[in-house]
From Swiss-Prot:
It is found in: Cytoplasm. This is Heat shock protein 83. Homodimer. Interacts with shu. GO terms for molecular function: ATP binding; ATP hydrolysis activity; ATP-dependent protein folding chaperone; unfolded protein binding. It comes from Drosophila miranda. Residues 225-245 have a biased composition (Basic and acidic residues). GO terms for cellular component: cytoplasm. Transmembrane segments: none annotated.
Length: 269
């Protein structure tokens, strides 16, 4: 029997902030992606730091990355990281019931004319998701707890329940249900533009799932290895989605900053 979802009220200042974000017109809504990628990077930093003293922390997944998955059919943009993840109490406390010290300060700054893009400096960048989404789910798995899912369509409350869907291993998956008038944020070119503009200095791979076969830069040795794999698989081509590293495909066959030649090879997902 599935566990029932528990409902929690947003702390009053957080509810006010969300209302402000949802009901005010902001021109630079795109900063939501910068904030969510920044949070993902912080979560990756935390698990990497923990693994320095306890390598077994990475037994739940050694690869550290951020993945973006636009789905036009479902109208969702999903941001996945293999970072430290959140426990149930983290989801309840960090995403709604305990106001960060910056919540009130940011609202006051906004009302005094500050730009929405400053939201991350006040520690409440997560809520920028509601600039472009009318519903958000956050599925998370921390090494010290089971997998849980947080959900809210704003409106003053959120739910948290045990999650028995696809196991994450470790990390966090944020699904944004995009507002009908914001669907340009599901376009591959738009996502790449935002990532290259705001998140180019993130220290982890940012992978973008795309609907067609694309090219990805690799080293000569990797290219040779994967070329063999491709030859073995060339009769198996399908229209399945593919992954590419954001910002790599335009620089095919150029030397990288270390002077190494890179080739483009096709990577299947």
């Amino acid at each position: 029997m599935p566990e029932e979802a528990e409902t929690f009220a947003f702390q009053a200042e957080i509810a006010q902030l969300m209302s402000l974000i949802i009901n005010t017109f902001y021109s630079n809504k795109e900063i939501f992606l910068r904030e969510l990628i920044s949070n993902a990077s912080d979560a990756l930093d935390k698990i990497r730091y923990e693994s320095l003293t306890d390598p077994s922390k990475l037994d739940s997944g050694k690869e550290l990355y951020i993945k973006l998955i636009p789905n036009k059919t479902a109208g969702t943009l999903t941001i996945i990281d293999t970072g430290i993840g959140m426990t149930k109490s983290d989801l309840v406390n960090n995403l709604g019931t305990i106001a960060k010290s910056g919540t009130k300060a940011f609202m006051e700054a906004l009302q005094a004319g500050a730009d929405i893009s400053m939201i991350g400096q006040f520690g409440v960048g997560f809520y920028s998701a509601y600039l472009i989404a009318d519903r958000v789910t956050v599925t998370s798995k921390n090494n010290d707890d089971e997998q849980y899912v947080w959900e809210s369509s704003a409106g003053g409350s959120f739910t948290v329940k045990a999650d028995n869907s696809e196991p994450l291993g470790r990390g966090t998956k944020i699904x944004l249900y995009i507002k009908e008038d914001q669907t340009d944020y599901l376009e591959e070119s738009k996502i790449k533009e935002i990532v290259n503009k705001h998140s180019q200095f993130i220290g982890y791979p940012i992978k973008l799932l795309v609907e067609k076969e694309r090219e990805k830069e690799v080293s000569d040795d990797e290219a040779d290895d994967e070329k063999k794999d491709d030859e073995a698989k060339k009769d198996m081509d399908t229209d399945e989605p593919k992954i590419e590293d954001v910002g790599e495909d335009e620089d095919a066959d150029k030397k990288d900053k270390d002077g190494k030649k890179k080739k483009t090879i096709k990577e299947k997902y």
